[in-house]
Amino acid sequence: MITTYEEALDWIHNRLRFGIKPGLERMEWMLEQLDFPQQNINAIHVAGTNGKGSTVSYLRNMLEEAGYKVGTFTSPYIETFNERISVNGQPISNEAMTALVQEVKPVVERLEHTNLGSATEFEVITIMAFLYFGYHDSVDYVVFETGLGGRYDSTNVVNPMVSIITNIGFDHMAILGDTVEEIAAEKAGIIKKEVPIITGAEQVKALDVITEEANLKQASLFVLGKEFKIENYEPLANGEGFTLKTPYGIFEHLQLNMLGYHQVKNAALAVMAVCYLKEKKKLSISNEQMIKGIQHTKWNGRFEIVNEHPLTIIDGAHNAEGIDSLLSTLRLHYEDRNIHLIFSCLNDKSADRMVQELETIAASITFTSFDFPRARAAGELYEMSTHRNKHMDEEWKKAIAYVKEKATGEQDMVVITGSLYFISEVRAFLLK
């Protein structure tokens, strides 16, 4: 019998041993047992290699600005586990989390006696989110972020009002495939019959796959750069400025408080989705509320300044495309700085390419590791590097202390990156 929050979390985390098991049969079985809570939800579904979390955040802030109560389901968490299921940006309470576990545990145990096998950790958390938003907290809208891929992701049992595929890049190839087409096909698996799809995917081969799936499902397709366009882009001192042209109107002088051209693209996708829903009378929102919403958006761990002396930025880039976005943001806003990098990543990432890219901008690069089952050893990363000013320490707190001791000049800055799991630990430590 689970009675405390700690027991509830332990029970959830114990599901980790079941790994990642693509497929929706277990989800469908459990949802049927719980009387289909997902059917009570006005959902927006977000997939893609990078930018999902930021896109979810832009959507939430716009809808909140219009007075709506908005649920979000995201992963991984940055500060507390509960933030994976949030309402208006606030994680649900420990009591609510415990009650959800008490409710789903018997269903999960019954599932184990079927030929479908055991539910994974991610499946259990997804079921809890459906239950919470479907029956326990009457929110107006819920934005669901996929965990991995799309077609067989446990969130893909939802029937959304609109779907978004942020972009297509190389990540989780062991599960999603090695080519752009294979990865795009997995992401395009979220496209539902007659549900519009909005995408920032750029590769011709990826767009071909998405277009084919959209045609098959009779889903209207809106492609960034075609049906809606970013114009008049300009980097600002503390953000980005741009104009967005959509089929439903032009938004001039849009401003973001988040840095990087990739954030302009994420915001454009979110604005396009809200424009579509407004046009179809699925929600009521003014252009001013949309503009204000995206301007107010912040997303922890995404190019976030956590210290001023020395200037220290943490960024959750965890694959080659994420590192590319990080580097272009640094070149755009901090090109005259000496950048001291601290890097750690997971075993299943293309670390060699990430290290090579980072070396092009680094005054120094320090490799470290962190307490996580799939974290890569600092020594392995160090061996990949050919940088003339490289260093390693398996303990990340020591690595940070070492770099901060060195970064004392006016132009020195520290950038910590490589994994969302890593920067979530670092963030808590640096903001203490």
Spans of model-derived segments:
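Active-site-proximal loop/hinge segments that shape catalytic or ion-binding/gating pockets
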Residues: 419
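ATP-dependent carboxylate-amine ligase catalytic core
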Residues: 31-32, 36-39, 65-158
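Short functional linear segments
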Residues: 1-48, 55-68, 73-75, 109-117
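C-terminal helical cap/extension that packs against the catalytic core
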Residues: 203-212, 216-222, 311-314, 320, ...
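Beta-strand->loop->alpha-helix junctions that form or flank phosphate-binding loops
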Residues: 200-201, 215-235, 256-261, 289-296, ...
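Short Gly/Thr/Asp-enriched flexible loops that form oxyanion-binding sites at enzyme active sites
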Residues: 59, 151-161, 427-431
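Nucleotide phosphate-binding/pyrophosphate-handling subdomain across enzymes
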Residues: 136, 141-146, 153-164, 168-172, ...
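Conserved catalytic-core segment of NTP-binding enzymes
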Residues: 150-151, 158-218
